Curated annotation (Swiss-Prot):
GO terms for molecular function: proton-transporting ATP synthase activity, rotational mechanism; proton-transporting ATPase activity, rotational mechanism. Keywords: ATP synthesis, Cell inner membrane, Cell membrane, CF(0), Hydrogen ion transport, Ion transport, Membrane, Transmembrane, Transmembrane helix, Transport. This is ATP synthase subunit b. GO terms for cellular component: plasma membrane; proton-transporting ATP synthase complex. The chain crosses the membrane at residues 3-23. InterPro entries: ATP_synth_B-like_membr_sf (IPR028987), ATP_synth_b/b'su_bac/chlpt (IPR002146), ATP_synth_F0_bsu_bac (IPR005864), ATP_synthase_B_chain (IPR050059). It comes from the Bacteria. Belongs to the ATPase B chain family.
Amino acid sequence: MNINFTLLAQALAFAGLIWIIATKIWPPLMNAIEERQQKIAEGLAAADRSQKDLAQAQEKVNEALKEARTKANEIIDQAHARANQIVDAARTEAITEATRQKDLAQAEIDAAANRAREDLRKQVSALAVTGAEKLLKREIDANAHKALLDELASEI
């Protein structure tokens, strides 16, 4: 066998192999690689979008929680304010009722004191009449001297 012929045959076989690979195998292989690259790029883009969506959702959740806390604090503040209003109203009502009862008691005390004064005036008038009877040793007509007795009673 001739070495030149062998080299030529190998060169032709190699060239044929290159041509077959370049026309039959290489294009589908490159298409498969490009499709795979596109799928990987789409997957990475989808992952990025998912991360962005997750970050946005997390922000929305945080904002919703913040808003819920704010509303809860407002409701609690309103409840405290309402409780304070109720306590103040009850306190005002209690003070009003206590003042009313105190005024009623004071009126009863004043009425009792006036009755006691009147009773005391009557007793003093009776004592004065009795004392005057004893001093004068005669009976004083109470009807005749009523004006005098009333004047004495008012002075007492």
